[in-house]
Amino acid sequence: MAREYSLLNTRNIGIMAHIDAGKTTTTERILFHTGKIHKIGETHEGASQMDWMAQEQERGITITSAATTAFWKNTRFNIIDTPGHVDFTVEVERSLRVLDGAVAVLDGQSGVEPQTETVWRQATNYRVPRIVFVNKMDKTGADFIYSVKTIGDRLGAKAAPIQLPIGAEENFTGIIDLVEMKAYEFDGKPEENYKEIEIPSNLLEQAKELRAHLVEVAVEYDEELLMKFLDGGEISISELKSAIRKGVINADFFPVLAGSAFKNKGVKLLLDAVVDYLPSPIDIPSIKGILPTGEEVERHASDTEPFSALAFKVMTDPFVGKLTFFRVYSGILTKGSYILNSTKQQKERVGRILQMHANNRTEIEEVYSGDIAAAVGLKNTTTGDTLCDEKHEIILESMVFPEPVIQLALEPKTKADQEKMSIALSKLAEEDPTFRTYTDDETGQTIIAGMGELHLDIIVDRMKREFNVATNVGAPQVSYRETIKLPGKAEGKYIKQSGGRGSYGHVVIEFEPNKDKGFEWVDKITGGRVSKEYINSARVGLENALRNGVIAGYPMIDVKATIVDGSMHEVDSNEMAYKIAASMALKEAARKMNPVVLEPIMNVEVTVPDEYYGDVMGNISSKRGMIEGSEQRGNAQTIKSKVPLTEMFGYATELRSFTQGRGNYTMIFSHYAEAPKAIADEIIKKSGK
């Protein structure tokens, strides 16, 4: 099967936004215009195509990033719809990793909102080129110029309009294209037909000023054009488009468009802008990877290069089982072929290859460089794994996911639910790298941990709906951590003699703080005093021991361990003995190393009308919060702070009550910090250690 669309005519794009900016509605309109759906589904009616999970349709928010393929003006779009709620930031993170460009959707009344800032930061980390669509221009209070200003003020990004809306609120009727200096009026019908009109005289001067500014900004990205501009030459439309495109692909300049997806205004022009300005797979830098020799190499977006891809999402499908979504960076993959999961060093067979449209699927024979598809039959592949040609091994840069910050206990309602619950939890954990599940050694309870209360609510809900498992849920609890503040050295010696063959394990380990670097293991044993096999066992034993800290039983983080000495017994040494010896060394050294309890600190942003500003400031301070600043947003104030998570339970209700429902907040994990002594003592006391 030959490639239908060239790499130049391929766009891998994401749609990203704050919750309620109209992102899913915008995606729906895109799918309608690109011929993928025949009846538009409205999010507020629970009929949206991309929001295909039952929970998403009930709550009207997008939880998992559904991938779909669509076509526009001889260009193939692979579109990923991403969630706007902070608890699902991991979905955004993994989508951005495999995309070439994105459309950031803003609310025309609010401009840049807190979650927009979070998603924008993530996109900047991955240098994803973006265009901005200011949506809801029909909404009361919509202000296009204000929204554009917030991009510079709040995101520090260089943005300029390439359109100017004609009218606003209920009088929003069309736009002026500032690149071509033409005006268009929309008919507001689902087909979104528009006709060219004269530029309204009351907007002509403003349009000319904005175009002059656009030209000034754009020519900076093309040296020849800049010289021509400085010499007073006229910049043609095609030259201007080319310069804008260069700035966008550089992830340095962000053109802004206007519209109202719900009212069928401006989405077709947005599609044209995706084709004109966002990059194809060959416009962006080639992906880098590591060869088995340790050498760094590039893989170019080309069908003739060896196959390489990144698995970015795993889902359990009720009909076909485990689906692995992947982005092909180079080469071609044919169904039925064998590939290597180089991350796990395991061979995998690709049973079927599916092209996805939300939760519908089309089976295809092969996928090409630059494509996004889903595979059936990959048994051992998880999110972030590299898939490649067996004869041309490479490991691509993986994804880093935040640690869960909130946990709760889960109990099956009946004996029949017990077995189903463990199957359901393992499948859900396989899908979502920020969701963890484990059994508490002391209580025997099943614990689930995630990024927020909504995240865990939806996990419990999915267990009930998809796996038919009924559970009793405990109150949410904070996931504390432990660490050490001083270095220490200890010996762990495990000797057990019981009749015949005994057990012998002996290690000497030096420990030291390893702030913000996680666990690190260094082997400094010389002369073969302990074999590599037993050194590895000691490492495994130590990692297991670190899962249950020494003062309150919470996982210990940021510890560097160097094994410096030890010994073996020619008959009695075994792997288990070295695992136990390493954990004994940790317990022995722990008290000397000033172990402390760490608590999660959250970035909290509260937006309230001016009259509640003082109340909120006082309230945050009473929660051990550190105020970092505030800014005026219209007639409201946004207060930025860092607050311990333990103080934030039930905050939504609290904020609602003292602002009469007029305040809102967002909360995102920032870092772990040492808990004050009084708090730590309370945590240790509760743990019963």
UniProtKB/Swiss-Prot annotation:
One of its GO terms (cellular component) is cytoplasm. Residues 8-282 form the tr-type G domain. The keyword Cytoplasm applies. GTP binds at residues 17-24, 81-85, 135-138. Pfam families: EF-G_D2 (PF22042), EFG_C (PF00679), EFG_III (PF14492), EFG_IV (PF03764), GTP_EFTU (PF00009). Keywords: Cytoplasm, Elongation factor, GTP-binding, Nucleotide-binding, Protein biosynthesis. Gene3D superfamilies: 3.30.230.10, 3.30.70.240, Elongation Factor G (Translational Gtpase), domain 3 (3.30.70.870), P-loop containing nucleotide triphosphate hydrolases (3.40.50.300), Translation factors (2.40.30.10). GO terms for molecular function: GTP binding; GTPase activity; translation elongation factor activity. GO terms for biological process: ribosome disassembly. It is found in: Cytoplasm. HAMAP family: EF_G_EF_2_B (MF_00054_B). Belongs to the TRAFAC class translation factor GTPase superfamily. Classic translation factor GTPase family. EF-G/EF-2 subfamily. Catalyzes the GTP-dependent ribosomal translocation step during translation elongation. During this step, the ribosome changes from the pre-translocational (PRE) to the post-translocational (POST) state as the newly formed A-site-bound peptidyl-tRNA and P-site-bound deacylated tRNA move to the P and E sites, respectively. Catalyzes the coordinated movement of the two tRNA molecules, the mRNA and conformational changes in the ribosome. This is Elongation factor G. It comes from Mycoplasma capricolum subsp. capricolum (strain California kid / ATCC 27343 / NCTC 10154). The gene is fusA.
